[in-house]
Swiss-Prot record:
Keywords: ATP synthesis, CF(0), Hydrogen ion transport, Ion transport, Membrane, Mitochondrion, Mitochondrion inner membrane, Transmembrane, Transmembrane helix, Transport. The gene is MT-ATP6. This is ATP synthase F(0) complex subunit a. The chain crosses the membrane at residues 5-25, 68-88, 97-117, 138-158, 164-184, 189-209. InterPro entries: ATP_synth_F0_asu, ATP_synth_F0_asu_AS, ATP_synth_F0_asu_bact/mt, F0_ATP_A_sf. Component of the ATP synthase complex composed at least of ATP5F1A/subunit alpha, ATP5F1B/subunit beta, ATP5MC1/subunit c (homooctomer), MT-ATP6/subunit a, MT-ATP8/subunit 8, ATP5ME/subunit e, ATP5MF/subunit f, ATP5MG/subunit g, ATP5MK/subunit k, ATP5MJ/subunit j, ATP5F1C/subunit gamma, ATP5F1D/subunit delta, ATP5F1E/subunit epsilon, ATP5PF/subunit F6, ATP5PB/subunit b, ATP5PD/subunit d, ATP5PO/subunit OSCP. Belongs to the ATPase A chain family. It catalyses: H(+)(in) = H(+)(out).
């Protein structure tokens, strides 16, 4: 019986009960809040990384935008940790599910848009009609800008889903080819194993980059509306 390539993306269950919630909570179990008065090296490294990420994300924001710092740092840590945990053998990556990514993207995008219309109504409406637009093109440009606005959360979710899913499929295919070639051609199997190792290293980088890109785009949407 042939193995389904997409079997690893099916939501795992125990006695018919989905365990996605347990998987999502795993990063919080692995990285608990420090309770010591003096931090150890691991905690100090984590805090340094958090401060570095905050500096990169919050440098473009004003006072109102910086109130989202906790939300943005939680978002990037959550996506990054779930992506990395999904690279472990026999594990499940929640960010390969489009429904989950849409569940993150739509509320965050909607919050930034509502915030913009609430505090900067004229500036938000001005985005639908660029300055200097010829009068005959006004209706068409308004429609195009409206569509592009509503596509933003879909683009966020699809980008994350596609990149993570594609990487897992490539690793699955190359890993399967390596196992098959082991008994047929050990020399070729060693080459595919080296490729698999390099691809795994690349996927670790992609897991972190996609978390940063997702959070950075949310930060840019927030900057446009504050």
């Amino acid at each position: 019986m042939n193995e389904n390539l997409f079997a690893s993306f099916i939501t795992p269950t125990i006695v018919g009960i989905p365990i996605v919630i347990l998987i999502i909570m795993t990063p919080y179990i692995i990285f608990p809040s420090p309770t010591r008065l003096i931090n150890n090296r691991l905690t100090s490294l984590q805090q340094w990384l958090v401060q570095l990420i905050l500096k990169q994300l919050m440098s473009i924001h004003n006072t109102k935008g910086r109130t989202w710092s906790l939300m943005l740092i939680s978002l990037i840590l959550f996506i990054g940790s779930t992506n990395l945990l999904g690279l472990l053998p026999h594990s499940f990556t929640p960010t390969t599910q489009l429904s989950m990514n849409l569940g993150m993207a739509i509320p965050l995008w909607a919050a930034t848009v509502i915030k913009g219309f609430r505090h900067k109504t004229k500036a938000s409406l001005a985005h639908f009609l660029p300055q200097g637009t010829p009068i005959p093109l006004i209706p068409m440009l308004v429609i195009i800008e409206t569509i592009s606005l509503f596509i933003q959360p879909m683009a966020l979710a699809v980008r994350l889903t596609a990149n993570i899913t594609a990487g897992h499929l490539l690793m699955h295919l190359i890993g399967g080819a390596t196992l098959v070639l082991t008994s047929i051609s050990p020399a070729t199997a060693s080459i595919t194993f080296i490729i698999l190792t390099l691809l795994t290293i690349l996927e670790f980088a992609v897991a972190l980059i996609q978390a940063y890109v997702f959070t950075l785009l949310v930060s840019l949407y927030l900057h446009d509306n504050t």
